Amino acid sequence: MTSAHEATPKAALYANVGADLTRYDVDVANAELIKRDTVTLPAGVQYAWPHASRRYLYVASSSSASGYGRAGTEHHVTAFAIDPATGALRQHGAPIPLPTRPIHISSDIPSENLLVAFNNPSGVRVYRINKDFSPGEEVAQPGPIDAGIFAHQVRVTPDNRLAILVTRGNEGTPTKAEDPGALKVFEYTNGVLANVVSIAPDGGKDFGPRHLDFHPTMPWMYVSIETQNKMVMYRMEPGRIEPGIAFRSDTLAEPGNIRARQAAGAVHVHPNGRFVYGANRAEATVEYQGKKVFKGGENSIVVYAIDQETGEQTPIQHIETQKIHPRTFHIHPSGRLMVAQHNLPVNVRDGDAVRTVAAGLSVFRIDDDGKLAFARTYDVDVGDKRMFWMGMVPLPA
């Protein structure tokens, strides 16, 4: 942890409502966010990723609805220069068009290329980052890409040798069989992808991975299994992911009390490598007094302690986020603060009455033992739009 005698690293927080991306200052000591200014994208923000230099932010946007909803026609990556003192954003170059809705964007380790995941149809493409840091042309791939079903995230391993496409598949319904999920692993060489292996236990049955993160110093990868509400750990070797699950844990506080659809979400490892965090999401509604109200379930952050010898994750806390559906969350680079973002306003029962829980941001302090202490919420009026992404970017020292 950062001691009181060390300077707290500065970071800017960015959160969207539809196509608008707003910057907030982050006051770690007081666990406060201060709203500043807003830039507007060509369409709704889907995800964003900073350049390794921390001086540019690449934002994926789309006019498509989420999931398998209405398909739009506007899909782009837009670059912004980050003011190193304040975090203010200034558009840098022209947006580049994409073929369909980008669900996730990241860069390789040196930020020479952008990797973009698409959910419908499932896919991954690589785009050069130009010498002037603007997004550039697509990298031609030598052969077909095995992109699975419903890609949700793409990441390059810390050694820059593999790219991993997290493909969730789809849960089964009374009228449609389950679509299998998988981790699609590719050799990665300067933007060129080559199929290596599909990690899909039992053929991907009951395996719906959504999001992963890497330990900062050890060869350990943590993956949330959205459709089974699990957190799993994989061991890594140079240029290889061991295909067997090393450790598996529940994400829910009450895995035997599923009140409505639960979905494990984002995963982030603490900067000190001692803890890993995951999101639990629920938003299903039922009719009550002529209104749709929250059916119940866990909207929480689960905290795991990481065994520093084995990498095994052990749950030590579940804490409610105070709002509904924490789609994204992020840890401040100081390791002392977490912020969670929530998509939409939802009606909830309050005794015999009904009240609305607004979309917005929840702020938590992170204690030395890794546990979270709730600090405050910020309501955000999303109108007919939604919050979809939030993240913090360290500013250059």
Give a label for each model feature:
Residues 24-31, 79-87, 126-136, 185-193, ...:
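Short loop/turn segments immediately following beta-strands, especially the blade-tip
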Residues 9, 44-46, 101-103, 150, ...:
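Beta-rich catalytic cores
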Residues 15-17, 66-75, 117-122, 172-181, ...:
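Short, solvent-exposed loop/turn segments at conserved positions within beta-propeller repeat blades
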Residues 88-158:
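Asp-box/WD-like beta-propeller blade repeats and closely related beta-sheet repeat scaffolds
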Residues 38-42, 94-99, 142-147, 199-205, ...:
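Surface loop/turn motifs at the tips and blade-to-blade linkers of beta-strand repeat domains
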Residues 7-9, 51-54, 107-111, 158-160, ...:
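Residue-level detector of Asp-centered blade-edge/turn motifs that repeat once per structural unit
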